[in-house]
Amino acid sequence: MRLFLALLALGFAAVAAVPANPQRIVGGSTTTIQQYPTIVALLFSRNGNTFFQACGGIILNNRNILTAAHCPHGDAVNRWRVRSGSTFANSGGAVHNLNRVRIHPNYNSRTLDNDIAIMRTSSNIAFNNAAQPARIAGANYNVGDNQVVWAAGWGDIRSGGPPSEQLRHVQVWTVNQATCRSRYASIGRSVTDNMLCSGWLDVGGRDQCQGDSGGPLYHNGVVVGVSSWGEECALARFPGVNARVSRFANWIRNNS
């Protein structure tokens, strides 16, 4: 799930990383894994027995998955599994155990700065038309304002909405950094240079949401963002916020 922020009497706080109910993309439509073979479903278990889709991830190679740090942060590695090669969140494809989670050393769980992590599977991911390594933005990959980008995932259709078993996608646009920073500053949140904002500014209705955390934001087929946080979902005034992949290109390469 993507974290969303709730206004509390004493300030602002992030909602817990794993929600009470598993989660979908807001304002999008259903799609198939063959259209997005680089995405995987991350499965979480509270008891070590029953697993459900809780976040998304991105295939880097046949053993490593890129995701948001807030998804596995603080959890034992055996609480998470990876489902690759399936259109559906909780069935099909291949399920892999994990043997390592590497969270960015500068990850800040309060501000969600540097919200990026790499999970290593215990077994190889077999590549086919439903599972492929992603093209990842390099350090010099710059995305301009108002560029068309696509998000995909199994998250909520609205804040607190019902789960989507089938993969969904939505077209949104990149948002000017200064504008995004100013909007969030008005409610006491910090948007850093390590973040990339996307949505349908001043219109709303399209966004990533809970359950989409860790999933990809694509620009011309290149992963430029990892879904991270936002103020609820799909609000006109507040875009979604992603980890900006180009800022972590060297770290990703060195740890995968």
From Swiss-Prot:
Keyword Secreted applies: yes
SUPFAM superfamilies: Trypsin-like serine proteases
Entry's localization field: Secreted, Extracellular space
Paired cysteines (S-S): 55-71, 180-197, 209-233
GO-annotated molecular function: serine-type endopeptidase activity
Propeptide residue interval(s): 18-24
Alphabetic keyword roster: Disulfide bond, Hydrolase, Protease, Secreted, Serine protease, Signal, Zymogen
Known tissue expression: Midgut.
Signal peptide as annotated in the record: 1-17
InterPro entries in UniProt: Peptidase_S1, Peptidase_S1_PA, Peptidase_S1_PA_chymotrypsin, Peptidase_S1A, Trypsin_dom, TRYPSIN_HIS, TRYPSIN_SER
Reaction catalysed by this enzyme: Preferential cleavage: Arg-|-Xaa, Lys-|-Xaa
GO biological process per UniProt: proteolysis
A cellular component term, taken from the record's GO annotations: extracellular region
CDD domains the record matches: Tryp_SPc
Top EC class of this enzyme: hydrolase
Marked site (Required for specificity) residue numbers: 207
Peptidase S1 domain residues: 25-256
Known EC number: 3.4.21.4
A Pfam cross-reference name: Trypsin
Matches recorded under PANTHER family: AT26814P-RELATED, POLYSERASE-RELATED
Family listed: Belongs to the peptidase S1 family.
Protein name from the UniProt record: Trypsin, alkaline B
Annotated source species: Manduca sexta
